[in-house]
């Protein structure tokens, strides 16, 4: 009850501070801010998303950077994404989970927290845009990229646990900031300075990304979807973004003030719920159009290798699919390693196995269902504006059952909320890495995070959000570069653990022990 009052009080204080801004937004202040930030945002975004041309298609360098790493990791660890898939499920189920191990959350809770940060609006809006611009064949390449991305998650989450800081009060702090600085210093004195620089860069990018893509964008897009289903411009909510932002910030405050254990408890409930809501709705549409399913899969496979009418041909299709997978599951970005590092385990590689499920669920399952719905209903549109992805998916849902956009709205709200609470944790850990772990730095970050929710819902700050989105993908450069130096460390952890697993030397707990 005390935490509830504290959360509401924090949100009300933030609302009071921002009320004048939301009013000024009606007078164009948000446009002035947007115009002032735009030149810098465009420069940063242009640099981070710099591209080169292949068959007339612009290929972002960051996309190649992420996919090359995923492919290298898959080969280096001998297709661990497939070999350890079954064992990962055993760990999620708790078969080998020592309740006395260091850490704050279970394997399942860590996975749910990380999933809540990746399974979001990109799975709904981004897939619709990818299929529209790349055709049904983009789905094939999206799935392939998701499978490769599993190896990236394995590596970064193993390192996140291995190099985390464990404190006397039982809390932990981990993620790329720690394995870049501590891991590279451990490898060689010559790499110590590089590790510190990469860690600071990652933390700075992570803080920026948490305020935009992990916060303002989520609040902005979920508010737009709610307005859309309640009457559009005529909706009584149309000019009340500040009110929506206030309510959401209060709900977020109730969760994040309790730390990772509170976040994990909530996400472990929300993630299964939102997955069931969205996946069930998608499967209902697929079932009602079951006769179209064979043709849809035929179009996916045919379109993957023979793309007529698609800009850039097969290369264009491949890029759209790979782009959506990479931008959706964030494999190689490093964000998920922060959540996974809080797990209770004494064997770092176990969380790497659990993390394999993140890209699989996010991309291979959820994104594929969205793609099938778009293809089967025939609502994909090559002329679609990238900002209209949610509307396109909503139209696909509505084409089968008129009230299904409401189901989609519930999913959007759940996706956005869960993404915000997860990214608040990512940003906080990066913030405290930069400014120290104290009560003041903790409260300062959380108040700022809650403030940005209200701003995101009530103001149109496109350039600010674009800049922050660029920060998320900028995280990939220091993260992946550092990981290359640490691959032998992960290999040693894997070989030692896998030998114990294969020879039956691992202790089982709970129901798993009783089954033996």
Whereabouts are the PLM-identified features?
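N-terminal alpha-helical transmembrane segments of multi-pass membrane transport
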Residues: 2-121, 131-138, 149, 484-516
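Transmembrane helix-loop junctions in multi-pass membrane proteins
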Residues: 25, 76-82, 123-126, 210-223, ...
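Extracellular/periplasmic helix-exit of transmembrane alpha-helices
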Residues: 26-27, 156-164, 168, 281-299, ...
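Extracellular loop-to-transmembrane helix junctions
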Residues: 55-84, 132-171, 362-369, 404, ...
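Membrane-interface loop-to-helix entry segments
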Residues: 68, 73-89, 198, 202, ...
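Helix-loop-helix module between adjacent transmembrane segments
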Residues: 73-74, 116, 145-172, 181-218, ...
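Flexible loop linkers connecting adjacent transmembrane helices
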Residues: 79-107, 129-131, 135-139, 151-192, ...
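Alpha-helical membrane segments and immediately flanking helix-loop junctions
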Residues: 100-133, 159-163, 168-184, 201-207, ...
């Amino acid at each position: 009850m005390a935490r509830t009052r504290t959360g509401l009080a924090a949100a009300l204080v933030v609302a009071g501070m921002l009320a004048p801004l939301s009013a000024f937004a009606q007078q164009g202040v948000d446009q002035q801010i947007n115009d002032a930030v735009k030149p810098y945002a465009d420069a940063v975004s242009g640099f981070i998303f710099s591209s080169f041309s292949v068959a007339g298609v612009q290929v972002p360098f960051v996309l190649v950077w992420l996919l090359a790493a995923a492919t290298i990791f898959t080969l280096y660890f001998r297709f661990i994404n497939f070999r350890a898939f079954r064992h990962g499920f055993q760990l999620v189920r708790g078969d080998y989970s020592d309740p006395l191990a260091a850490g704050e959350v279970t394997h399942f809770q860590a996975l749910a927290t990380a999933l809540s940060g990746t399974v979001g609006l990109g799975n709904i809006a981004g897939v619709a845009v990818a299929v529209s611009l790349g055709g049904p064949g983009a789905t094939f390449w999206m799935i392939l990229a998701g499978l490769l991305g599993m190896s990236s998650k394995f590596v970064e989450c193993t390192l996140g646990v291995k190099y985390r800081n464990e404190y006397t009060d039982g809390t932990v702090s981990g993620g790329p900031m720690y394995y870049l600085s501590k891991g590279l210093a451990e490898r060689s004195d010559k790499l110590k300075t590089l590790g510190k620089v990469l860690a600071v860069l990652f933390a700075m990018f992570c803080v920026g990304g948490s305020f935009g893509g992990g916060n303002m964008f989520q609040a902005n897009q979920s508010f737009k979807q709610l307005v859309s289903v309640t009457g559009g411009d005529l909706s009584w909510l149309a000019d009340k973004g500040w009110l929506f932002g206030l309510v959401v910030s209060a709900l977020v405050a109730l969760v994040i003030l309790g730390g990772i254990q509170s976040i994990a408890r909530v996400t472990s409930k929300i993630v299964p719920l939102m997955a069931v809501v969205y996946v069930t709705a998608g499967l209902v549409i697929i079932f009602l159009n079951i006769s179209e399913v064979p043709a849809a899969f035929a179009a996916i496979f045919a379109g993957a290798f023979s793309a007529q009418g698609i800009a850039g041909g097969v290369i264009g299709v491949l890029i759209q699919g790979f782009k959506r997978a990479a931008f959706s599951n964030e494999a190689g970005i490093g964000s998920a390693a922060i959540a996974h590092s809080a797990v209770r385990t004494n064997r770092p590689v176990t969380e790497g196995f659990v993390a394999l499920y993140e890209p699989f669920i996010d991309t291979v399952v959820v994104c594929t269902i969205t793609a099938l719905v778009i293809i089967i209903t025939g609502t994909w549109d090559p002329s679609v504006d990238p900002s209209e992805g949610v509307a396109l998916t909503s139209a696909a849902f509505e084409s089968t059952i008129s009230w299904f956009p409401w189901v989609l709205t519930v999913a959007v709200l759940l996706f956005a909320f869960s993404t915000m609470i997860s990214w608040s944790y990512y940003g906080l850990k990066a913030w405290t890495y930069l400014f120290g772990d104290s009560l003041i730095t903790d409260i300062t970050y959380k108040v700022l995070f809650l403030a940005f929710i209200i701003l995101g819902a009530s103001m149109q700050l496109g350039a600010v959000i674009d800049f922050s989105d660029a920060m998320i993908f900028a995280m990939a450069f220091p993260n992946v570069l550092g990981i290359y130096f640490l691959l032998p460390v992960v290999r040693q952890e894997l070989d030692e653990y896998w030998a114990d697993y294969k020879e039956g030397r691992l202790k089982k707990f709970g129901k798993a022990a009783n089954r033996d």
